[in-house]
Design a protein with these regions (language model features):
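Glycine-rich strand-loop-strand elements at beta-sheet edges
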Residues: 85, 89-119
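Terminal (often C-terminal
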Residues: 1-76, 89, 99, 133-151
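A short linear-motif detector with a strong N-terminal bias
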Residues: 41-44, 102-104, 124-128
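Beta-strand signatures of extracellular beta-sandwich domains
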Residues: 80-84, 124
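Extracellular beta-strand-rich recognition modules
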Residues: 60-70, 108-112, 121-128
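Short, acidic/polar N-cap/turn motifs at the starts of alpha helices
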Residues: 51-53, 80, 112
């Protein structure tokens, strides 16, 4: 069966469901999301919920997809989302760029990325840039991280 995964965060009983600024409990201001808590798909059994990593089981070309909700309250609300391979951001900045200008602004952020990876590599989703009072909310099934082997 072709390697594929899809994880999300239910977050029942735990309000740490965002990364960035914005007040309240946050996983971190920037960095990788390590607290996904639910799997919908994991055909190779290679996603580790304890650290938010998908360990590449077979070398090949992979498609990665991730989503969350950008929330902005005030200030210079710039947020970038990205993927990380073996702990490093896949680019010099994020794959997406969001900037708020309306109080209580919310919109969906979706990122995609295609890359050849070797067996044993690991991938994560995260936020390399979060300024002012904004965050990427991924709890309550409003965000997800997924991927699959193209070939």
């Amino acid at each position: 069966q072709r390697p594929a995964f899809y994880v999300w965060r239910d977050g029942t009983g735990n309000n740490v469901e965002a990364i960035g600024h914005g007040g309240g409990d946050r996983l971190a201001v920037t960095g990788v999301i390590t607290n996904w808590d639910s799997k919908r798909v994991d055909t190779a059994g290679a996603f580790d919920l304890s650290n938010g990593r998908y360990y590449i089981p077979v070398s090949g070309l992979y498609m990665l997809i991730g989503a969350g909700v950008y929330r902005w309250a005030s200030g210079n609300g710039i947020l970038e989302a990205s993927f990380y391979v073996n702990g490093s951001n896949v680019g010099p900045r994020g794959i997406s760029y969001s900037r708020g200008n309306t109080t209580s602004e919310h919109h969906t952020v979706t990122i995609t990325f295609m890359r050849f990876m070797n067996a044993g590599d690991y991938v994560q989703m995260g936020v390399p840039v979060a300024q002012s009072a904004c965050d990427l909310y991924y709890g309550d099934n409003l965000g997800y991280f997924s991927g699959y082997l193209l070939g």
